From Swiss-Prot:
The gene is rnpA. This is Ribonuclease P protein component. SUPFAM superfamilies: Ribosomal protein S5 domain 2-like. It comes from Rippkaea orientalis (strain PCC 8801 / RF-1). Consists of a catalytic RNA component (M1 or rnpB) and a protein subunit. RNaseP catalyzes the removal of the 5'-leader sequence from pre-tRNA to produce the mature 5'-terminus. It can also cleave other RNA substrates such as 4.5S RNA. The protein component plays an auxiliary but essential role in vivo by binding to the 5'-leader sequence and broadening the substrate specificity of the ribozyme.
Length: 127
């Protein structure tokens, strides 16, 4: 099961904007790029996510798709805690084809806290 449509980055133009103007946060396995949307309305747009996995990670599409599913699952778990109004692209670094879901969840939590996207909880409480 994927992410809700409201929470997906779709067009290459959106990905390019995040890559060019977004802030970068990285861990051992993941790279998080964040572009905050400055919306003048009182209702900010929901946070949107995109996942980019290069063929350098694995030549096999099966492996890349499995990694995408694991990352989407981690995002779904964290979605209620995520502040609205950002566009986020998550990239995978190096050889992570052997990583488990729990590793992605833990690293994604750390990166989202570092980027101040998870709100309402202190670092000690959430980790």
């Amino acid at each position: 099961m994927g992410l809700p449509k409201l929470n997906r980055l779709k067009s290459p133009r959106e990905f390019q904007a995040v890559y060019q103007r977004g802030q970068r946060y990285q861990s051992d396995r993941l790279v998080l790029r964040v572009l905050w949307i400055t919306d003048k309305t009182s209702n900010p747009a929901p946070t949107q996510f995109g996942i980019a996995i290069s063929q350098k990670v694995s030549k096999k599409a099966v492996v890349r798709n499995r990694l995408k599913r694991q990352i989407k699952g981690a995002i779904r778990v964290l979605l209620p805690f995520i502040a609205p109004g950002a566009k986020i692209v998550i990239s995978v670094r190096g050889n992570v084809s052997e990583c488990q879901y729990e590793h992605f969840l833990r690293e994604l939590k750390k990166l989202l806290i570092k980027a101040k996207i998870i709100y309402g909880h202190t670092r000690e409480y959430f980790l």
